[in-house]
Amino acid sequence: LPGYTRFWNSADKAGYSGTAVFTRHQPLSVTYDFGIDEHRHEGRVITAEYPDFYLVCCYTPNSKDQLARLDYRMAWEDDIRDYLLDLDAKKPVVYCGDLNVAHQEIDIKNPGPNRRNPGFTDEEREKMTKLLSSGFVDTFRYLYPDKTGAYSWWSYRFNARKNNAGWRIDYFIVSERLKDKIRNADIWSEVLGSDHCPVVLDLDV
């Protein structure tokens, strides 16, 4: 892609997980993962440092069927929150990606039947609440607290996308001191090609 510098963080296992950042502005530094060996093998985090903020691109682990990875997910959530808070002590943070949780009932089409499904367990939702309570803002909900039918992921089954039976699990989350710089946050649900769609943040930094 002309004009963009690319950074990749791949999983040890081929074809599994991984993150990427494409940027028109050269970062001051780029780091991969976040210093804990347990989380070092799935390519889930890239941090790009810019003069006025950190960009943290993340693909949060899925808790899996029968919640087989829920315990790991809980440890991940605590560790990534600590990492974000460490960064936030230095300069503001923009945290984005597939965070694999629909935080509130408004963020999922069918909350009732999904209460113990991965991505909508009480445990996962509580971890998101704890993160936001630590000094971070969900940019989309900050601007549109009551907007319904706004989703970023749809199952390939049951005509979910056609029926807009989706989940909002992709986010831009920013340090609270950046909230007055949020110009817009959007979900481009019309963009096809994946079971996810792009989410967008316009931030005045």
Predicted features along the sequence, with ranges:
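Conserved beta strand-loop-helix elements of the APE1-like EEP
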Residues: 14-30, 148, 157-180
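Surface polyanion/phosphate-binding segment centered on an Asp-His-Pro turn
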Residues: 186-205
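Surface-exposed cleft-lining segments at the edges of enzyme active sites
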Residues: 35-36, 61-77, 112-117
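Metal-dependent phosphoesterases centered on the DNase I-like endonuclease/exonuclease/phosphatase
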Residues: 2-5, 76-165, 169
